[in-house]
Regions:
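Acidic, polar-rich low-complexity tracts and alpha-helical solenoid repeat scaffolds
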Residues: 1-218
Length: 218
């Protein structure tokens, strides 16, 4: 790789319009050597066209910016790679990293990250990252206590995981208790019944729903 870097960097510096493919290879060589500033310098010159090379370059750019501590540019690079569809594996990795950065840098309860996590699970239900995304979503659902928004979010997921369904059962129960407290007893019965009908994902929520549904009938 040292030899490749020497040859390519000499070519790039002596040529007015170096080939994008050569800039890309040079950038990847720099990345593999851990020279992230030079990676950015090389690869940022390759993203002039909408093609597979650009999508790959944006993924490397995102990872390089992360290594350099520049989360804002990393987020934009991952977003660019995630919105391109030439390579689905690149799209998957980029979308996951983009969602994480949105979650870390702009977390305001029910924000953009939840929508991106939903989209990720619908686009890549069998992803190696699916479990982590489910964990992040459940964390947001239960810590923000915005149960109505959480239920709407869960209902958008085509193939919810066991963790998501466990959270859904608790959310239905919590919404039922809110309805009960507001003397909306028909709504409370409906919500408690939905929690019960989900089955045994969350036995505590199910048992509590049975009890409070009985109270709601009186």
């Amino acid at each position: 790789q040292e030899k490749a870097i020497r040859m390519l960097s000499k070519y790039v510096s002596s040529t007015e319009n170096p080939l994008r493919s050569d800039l890309y290879i040079l950038g990847v060589c720099y990345f593999n050597k851990g020279n992230y500033s030079n990676t950015v310098n090389a690869l940022s010159r390759t993203v002039r066209q909408n093609d597979e090379l650009t999508q790959n370059a944006y993924l490397y750019l995102g990872q390089s910016y992360l290594k350099l501590g520049d989360k804002n540019n990393a987020r934009m690079a991952f977003e660019a790679a995630a919105t391109s569809s030439f390579d689905k594996q690149i799209k998957e990795v980029a979308m996951y990293n983009y969602a994480l950065l949105i979650h870390e840098t702009a977390f305001t309860g029910f924000g953009e990250s939840v929508t991106i996590f939903e989209d990720f699970l619908n686009d890549f239900p069998n992803s190696q990252y699916a479990d982590k995304v489910n964990d992040y979503l459940v964390e947001v659902y239960l810590t923000t206590k915005n149960y109505e928004a959480a239920l709407k979010s869960i209902n958008k997921i085509k193939h919810p995981s066991t963790k998501i369904l466990e959270a859904k059962q608790d959310i239905l129960f919590q919404l039922g208790t809110q309805a009960f407290a507001n003397v909306k007893l028909d709504d409370a019965v409906s919500l408690f019944s939905q929690a019960i009908q989900l089955g045994s994902y969350n036995m505590e929520a199910r048992n509590d729903a049975y009890f409070w549904r009985g109270e709601s009938y009186y």
